[in-house]
């Protein structure tokens, strides 16, 4: 069973994923899976290197994600090509992890709806915070306001994702309130799974 956690960049998906892990959930982050695909001897490594050349390599021989981002966020065609390579690889890795055992997999999938993957999820949790909080989180990561705005504008609005989700978690709140929301959602999902058995 796949429980997808989605939301825009800087919404707090990783923090929420950690909360679920602390509650005993099996967890995975699609971004981590994608980053793993960029390592040498992984399927995406050779394909991307053949397509863009050595200019996308970091000094340590891995693919430089910042250089790749610079390419794909300047060209819709290059972004579409990258997605056509990466999405099937990431999706298969997530499905493999979900099928390892009977426990539900709580997986952070930032672009769940944009990628058309919502049908693969048994339940969807959407994470929301106000745009200024989201912007401040991205600036704290070292992003310029303009770069953050461009990235946010390239994704679905958080409100649109909320409307399509089974559960919602508001992340622009106190740590305790966030932990309480995660516990309540986790218990509701576990109860629904138990009832369906």
Language-model-detected regions and their locations in the chain:
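ATP-dependent NMP and nucleoside kinases share a basic, alpha-helical "lid"
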Residues: 92-99, 104-140
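Walker A/P-loop
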Residues: 14
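The conserved Walker
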Residues: 9
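Residue-level signal for inorganic ion chemistry
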Residues: 31, 82, 106, 148, ...
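ATP-dependent small-molecule kinase phosphotransfer cores
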Residues: 32-103
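Small-molecule kinase domains that catalyze NTP-dependent phosphoryl transfer to phosphate-bearing small molecules
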Residues: 93-94, 119-120, 136, 143-190, ...
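Hydrophobic anchor at the beta1->P-loop junction of P-loop NTPases
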Residues: 5
């Amino acid at each position: 069973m796949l429980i997808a956690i989605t939301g825009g960049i800087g919404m707090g998906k990783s923090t929420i994923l950690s909360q679920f892990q602390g509650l005993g959930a099996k967890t995975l982050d699609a971004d981590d899976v994608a980053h793993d695909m960029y390592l040498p001897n992984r399927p995406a490594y050779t394909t991307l290197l053949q397509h863009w050349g050595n200019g996308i390599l970091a000094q340590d021989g891995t693919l430089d994600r910042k250089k790749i981002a610079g390419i794909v966020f300047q060209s819709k065609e290059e972004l579409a090509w990258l997605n056509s390579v990466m999405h099937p690889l990431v999706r298969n890795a997530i499905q493999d992890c979900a099928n390892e055992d009977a426990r539900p997999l709580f997986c952070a999938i930032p672009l769940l709806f944009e990628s058309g993957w919502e049908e693969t999820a048994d339940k969807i949790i959407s994470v929301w915070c106000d745009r200024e909080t989201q912007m401040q989180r991205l600036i704290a990561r070292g992003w310029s306001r303009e770069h953050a705005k461009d990235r946010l504008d390239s994704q679905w609005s958080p409100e649109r994702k909320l409307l399509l989700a089974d559960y919602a978690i508001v992340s622009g709140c106190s740590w305790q309130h966030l932990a309480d929301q995660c516990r309540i959602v986790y218990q509701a999902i576990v109860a629904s799974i138990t009832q369906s058995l």
